[in-house]
Amino acid sequence: LLLVNQLMDLRKNQSGNLQLRVSHNDLYLFTQEIYISFNQIAVKERITFRLESDESGIDAWFDRVLLEKVFFNLLSNAFKHTAPDESITIRLQLFSVAGLQEQFPGRISGEVRGTSRYVCLSVEDTGKGIDDSDKFHIFSPFYQGTDESESNTAGTGIGLSLVLSIVKLHKGVVWVEDNKPKGAVFRVLIPVNREA
């Protein structure tokens, strides 16, 4: 059923019919609900799982249903590629545009503008990481990483493409980078103001 829903969402996006329905919410509480729902998996898999935030209340305009799909895909991938006794962290940080340019130089030039504040949603893991050759294609529809074909947990290659589409609908940016000393970090920037 999940695969069918993701295919339908991908198809809607390709045809221009994936609609954004934003409402005013507390992004921290929303993220905390998602954290709680994944915590059982972390306990079962013996993975250290944390939620860290600059602020305990983050007023933002976003589509709850679609942003939940972003979190679900990013966290599902993190859990799939993180072994027992490793860790996964969800991190929320608020930035001005100037703060973003200082924190992530060269990452967001031209894609983030205006006076809006942005929230950076990061999913960080200490798993096996992502090959450099895969980083350029990882958000393409149906792309599977080089190690996926040899894995018994191979995905469909739809999830990260859907993440990119949803983030763009929110007028945001998403990318992946290495987590030091090992693992991967997916960062999602979305504006918190309705006007954005």
Regions picked out by a protein language model, each given a short descriptive name:
Residues 1-10, 30:
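Coiled-coil phosphoacceptor/dimerization helix of two-component systems
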Residues 11-22:
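Helix-loop junction within the histidine kinase core
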Residues 21-26, 43, 48-58, 95:
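Conserved catalytic submotifs in the C-terminal HATPase_c
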Residues 78-79:
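Short helix-loop "hinge" at the ATP-lid/N-box region of the Bergerat-fold HATPase_c
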Residues 136-140:
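ATPase catalytic-site recognition across NTP-hydrolyzing enzymes
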Residues 154, 159, 163:
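Short alpha-helical Gxxx[C/S/T] motif in the catalytic ATP-binding
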